[in-house]
A protein has these predicted regions:
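A short helix->beta-strand "capping" segment at the edge of beta-propeller domains
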Residues: 12-27
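Immunoglobulin-like IPT/TIG beta-sandwich domains and homologous Ig-like subdomains
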Residues: 23-32, 39, 43-45, 51-64, ...
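Beta-propeller and closely related beta-sheet repeat lectin domains
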Residues: 31-34, 82-87, 138-142, 184-187, ...
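Residue-level detector of Asp-centered blade-edge/turn motifs that repeat once per structural unit
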Residues: 36-39, 88-91, 144-147, 189-192, ...
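Conserved beta-propeller blade signature
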Residues: 42-44, 95, 150-152, 195-197, ...
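A detector of repeated loop/turn-to-beta-strand junctions in beta-rich toroidal repeat architectures
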Residues: 50, 66, 83, 109-112, ...
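Beta-propeller blade signature
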Residues: 53-60, 111-121, 159-165, 205-214, ...
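Blade-level signature of beta-propeller repeat domains, shared across WD40, Kelch, NHL, RCC1
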Residues: 341-376
Length: 489
């Protein structure tokens, strides 16, 4: 009770400081995770039923503090997962796979192998099958690859599989070289298209996966141990057979690729008893130190980020959610607690650069300090000078996908934001997020490479002179002028 009172006071101070804004329209039910859709809306999952999903959209001025909620459908019967793999596809659809828990399960863990795909245009869910031979998926790591394929790891094995977004068919990938099973590991997409992970079972080893070769290889030791020992000394049942018993290897914290090419990796509790401060480590993915790990600072206050969240702020700093509820910020040199702010729930990075934190009745927007380096922004090269409501257009440029996936949560419920949004603002200050889709890449830090996406102009948009921006990871391009015409072309 004392901790709850302390947290309540901290939230009150945060609201008073101006760093945090409380939503005027709170969620109709408690939500447990959030994903940014390509039309600027936020998809959330009901904490109560776990089958029902909602979308939250900003108001006419683009203000996320004064938006509206609407229910947008339910998963298929028998599938109400908690802690699953997830991501947006390049065409704008949303995919989920597995689930550590599922409503109505017979065992302590369910590790279900079900899945589903959400179509944001039709607002419908379609059941998704599992890779051949995968009896269990659970809370598995996943990532969208630069070529648009969805890569999923099997929690209980070294297995990996690709989902073809066009056919929604799975193909078993090579897992050659994988040092341990995928359980509790998080995957971080690097600029060269490879995936970095810090092992949990085989800690402090780290590994790199190359989709081009289908091989894993060691990325060396993380120097400090980032994983915590499991509190469950006995295995946990997830199926009817005697062998269907899971021995957890422990937990680890989230990892974020920063604009300078370093990956800030956070740890869970340290020490054999799991009661020490979490460690951190920095991986250099480019430059003269490429492929090297160095130890970072320990968490202040004896805290840690085991199975928690991290967000890349537009400033390039990493916001980390401590297990205590405190927020910490890594700026590349120092790791300090954030004053006048508190972690109230799962986060999502918004196109405004704000960070929404979900809570049952106190969902807030965190306003991070600082601003991005101008060189990190998307740059528009070619675009339609005139657009018509209801029509689709192509826009090209550079760095449309940002410099990082920008979001991380341990080993499951991935919600990266490395895809372009197109925002149109008219002379009256009304903001319209178009729906983008069919991005040419889902990579990160694409540099001077020419990339593109398509955007659907809303049918409700007002005619007249307007500005258009491309936004990635909360960082907007320089605006360009367009004309919204009512004439059909």
């Amino acid at each position: 009770m004392q901790m709850q009172t302390s947290n309540a006071r901290a939230r009150a101070r945060a609201l008073a400081s101006g760093r945090v804004t409380r939503l005027l329209s709170q969620p109709p039910v408690a939500m447990q995770m959030a994903w940014l859709m390509t039309d600027g809306s936020i998809l959330t999952q009901s904490q109560l039923t776990r089958q029902n999903f909602y979308r939250y959209s900003p108001d006419a001025k683009g203000d996320y503090a004064a938006g509206k909620w609407r229910e947008v459908g339910s998963l298929q019967a028998g599938y109400a997962p908690l802690a699953f793999a997830s991501s947006l596809l390049a065409d704008g659809r949303f995919v989920i796979s597995g689930g550590e828990y599922n409503s109505g399960g017979k065992y302590t863990l369910q590790l279900v192998n079900l899945g589903a795909v959400y179509d944001p245009v039709k607002m419908t869910w379609t059941a998704l099958g599992h890779p051949h031979g995968w009896g269990w998926i659970g809370d598995s790591p996943s990532s969208i690859l630069p070529d648009g394929r969805y890569l999923l790891g099997d929690k209980l094995h070294e297995w990996d599989a690709y989902l073809d977004p066009k056919t929604l068919q799975w193909t078993r990938a090579s897992d050659a070289g994988k040092a341990d099973f995928n359980a509790e590991e998080g995957w971080t997409l690097l600029a060269d298209g490879t995936i970095l992970t810090a092992d949990v079972k085989n800690a402090p080893n780290s590994e790199i996966y190359d989709p081009a070769t289908g091989h894993w290889k060691s990325a060396g030791t993380t120097v400090v141990d980032l994983h915590s020992p499991t509190p469950d000394r006995d295995c946990v049942k997830y199926g009817p057979k005697p062998k269907d018993c899971y021995s957890a290897p422990g937990e680890i914290g989230p990892a974020i690729l920063r604009p300078d090419g370093t990956v800030f990796y956070t740890g869970s509790f340290s020490g054999p008893q799991g009661n020490g401060a979490g460690h951190t480590a920095i991986y250099y993915s480019k430059g003269r130190k490429a492929g090297k790990w160095v130890a970072g600072p320990d968490f202040p206050n004896g805290d840690n980020a085991g199975d928690s969240f991290a967000v890349l702020e537009p400033s390039g700093n990493v916001l980390v959610f401590g297990g205590s509820g405190a927020l910490y910020e890594w700026n590349g040199k120092t790791f300090t607690q954030v004053r006048n702010a508190w972690a109230v729930g799962p986060p999502i990075l918004l196109p405004t650069g704000q960070i929404m934190m979900l809570a049952a009745s106190s969902t807030v927007l965190y306003n991070p300090p600082g601003s991005p380096n101008a060189s990190w922004a998307p740059a528009i090269k070619s675009y339609p000078k005139s657009v018509v409501p209801g029509k689709t257009y192509k826009i090209t440029g550079t760095q449309f996908n940002g410099l990082s996936q920008a979001m991380a949560y341990g080993d499951e419920e991935q919600n990266p934001t490395n895809y372009p949004l197109v925002r149109i603002t008219n002379a009256a200050g009304n903001v319209y997020y178009t729906r983008t889709h069919d991005h040419s890449t889902m990579g990160v830090a694409t540099g001077s490479k020419l990339v593109w996406t398509y955007f659907d102009v809303p049918k409700t948009i007002s005619s007249g002179v307007a500005t258009l921006e491309v936004v990635a990871n909360g960082i907007a391009s320089k605006p360009v002028k367009i004309v919204v015409s009512t004439a059909r072309r």
